[in-house]
Amino acid sequence: MLRACQLSGVTVAAQSCLCGKFVLRPLRPCRRYSTSSSSGVTAGKIAGAGLLFVGGGIGGTILYAKWDSHFRESVEKTIPYSDKLFGMVLGSAPYTVPLPKKPIQSGPLKISSVSEVMTDSELPMAQTQETNGDTPASAAGDPAPEVEHEDTINTECPNTDEGTSTFVTAALAKSLEDALNQTATVTRQTITAQNAAVQAVKAHSSTLKTAMDNSEIAGEKKSAQWRTVEGALKERRKAVDEAADALLKAKEELEKMKTIIEDAKKREIAGATPYITAAEEKLHSMIVDLDSVVKKVQAAQSEAKVVSQYHELVVQARDDFRKELDSITPDITPGWKGMSISDLAGTLSTDDLNALIAHAHRRIDQLNRELAQQKATEKQHIELALERQKLEEKRAFDSAVAKALEHHRSEIQAEQDRKVEEVRDAMENEMRTQLRRQAAAHTDHLRDVLKVQEQELKFEFEQDLSEKLSEQELEFHRRSQEQMDNFTLDINTAYARLRGIEQAVQSHAVAEEEARKAHQLWLSVEALKYSMKTSSAEMPTIPLGSAVEAIRVSCSDNEFTQALTAAIPPESLTRGVYSEETLRARFYAVQKLAGRVAMIDETKNSLYQ
């Protein structure tokens, strides 16, 4: 494989020097330079050597491109149509997102109860190498470059690949650093909230113990103590709720960070393994610190639960004892326990005292029996608790051992990946050195071949250029004539359309004038009809002179309208006519009288007689 890669280096270096603008065709130049005496043998040897050289170079290039994706990317960028060849032989290239990244030195993130996250100043950045690779921009007809320029490009192409790889690695490191900073900030806040919850739980337990121990205090002091206990309980609930919310948020951030690390692993970026390993170590430290502080909160809550149960049992025992005393001495005023002995001397009788003493003896015997039974029971409970504790400690020990083994395996894997990366870099450097040497050894031969190709391509280019120019000139004249004809046709069409628009506008104006006159006539007739319908109380008749005059004015050029208005009697114009309302009212009056007349029979009798 190394020999094939060395052979491929010549082709890749030569083609990368010329930016992939020319194709190597060694047979024709060799035939032109061959002498007449040994043309057959020399041509066959050169043809065979050329085919072997080109085939070995292409095969070695494909094999090395399959092993190194960055080398494949550089060849695809430098040599045209090489991406299609790689796609047919090797398939599609793995996709890598070129994000800006800054390489950082890996370091463990130590988070204590007040965790501190390493900032940018604590994570020194590696200096990125500046890329000085010139962008190839030679055209098809440019002369072949000199040997010195080829060597320069051969030297700078690896630097360009190195700079691209460093750029991608730096972007990955920057993204991991930002995600770690955010996760560490949330974890630190969560740890602070958990510690505050522990302090609140301990404060509540302490105040509750104090209030239960000082049972002899009565009055306002006792009330103040219980108010303090209630306040501590509220603070405890608030702190525990805040700690739970912060813990959920921290778990979400840790899951996001874990997803980011897994995505970075899947991308398989060269040189990114140290940063991914450092991020995993810091994430593991955060998880361990968070678990420890959560265990502290759980332990504090367990202790507080025991104190609360103890308080409930004490309160229940006091209530039971008070009920027993009330049943023994029902005549004594409640609350006698707070009285002094001198006050109780005249209150309790001999029978009451004997009853209290007898009850105290029975109670002591009962408590002694319960104490003995409790001791035996607790002994069994202690044995069971010890067994459970041993099992829990064994499980915790197994879990701790598993975590330690996992951490150790991750460290070994990281070290192995680091060594593999170093060996890979050394192999790449050696391969690039061999490629440069092979390219320098065959530069003279390539220069001669490329000069011949340059002359051929220049001749072909000039011939194609003259043909294309003549075709373009003919095409230009044809398109100019077509545009002139189309322009003339468009002008004629627009002129005809303009004439049609003018005629349509004139006819529309005449129609609008006729419609306006008809509308005025209609309005005048409607006014006349309205005046004939309505009337006022002072004037039963309505003169029609003004309405008729309006009709005459609006239709002065209409003979039919003038004849119709002239036929109206002058009395109607001056005196007026009865309106429709007046006639309707008179008709109703006449109808009423006619109805009354109809009620008179043949004998002239009616309801009025």
From Swiss-Prot:
Gene Ontology BP, a term: neuron cellular homeostasis
One matching Pfam family: Mitofilin
Residue span of region Disordered: 127-162
Record PTM Phosphoserine, positions in chain: S112, S113, S175, S340, S342
Residue ranges that the UniProt entry lists as topological domain Mitochondrial matrix: 34-45
Family: Belongs to the MICOS complex subunit Mic60 family.
Biological role stated in the UniProt entry: Component of the MICOS complex, a large protein complex of the mitochondrial inner membrane that plays crucial roles in the maintenance of crista junctions, inner membrane architecture, and formation of contact sites to the outer membrane. Plays an important role in the maintenance of the MICOS complex stability and the mitochondrial cristae morphology.
Subunit relationships: Component of the mitochondrial contact site and cristae organizing system (MICOS) complex, composed of at least MICOS10/MIC10, CHCHD3/MIC19, CHCHD6/MIC25, APOOL/MIC27, IMMT/MIC60, APOO/MIC23/MIC26 and MICOS13/MIC13. This complex was also known under the names MINOS or MitOS complex. The MICOS complex associates with mitochondrial outer membrane proteins SAMM50, MTX1 and MTX2 (together described as components of the mitochondrial outer membrane sorting assembly machinery (SAM) complex) and DNAJC11, mitochondrial inner membrane protein TMEM11 and with HSPA9.
Protein name: MICOS complex subunit Mic60
Organism, scientific name: Rattus norvegicus
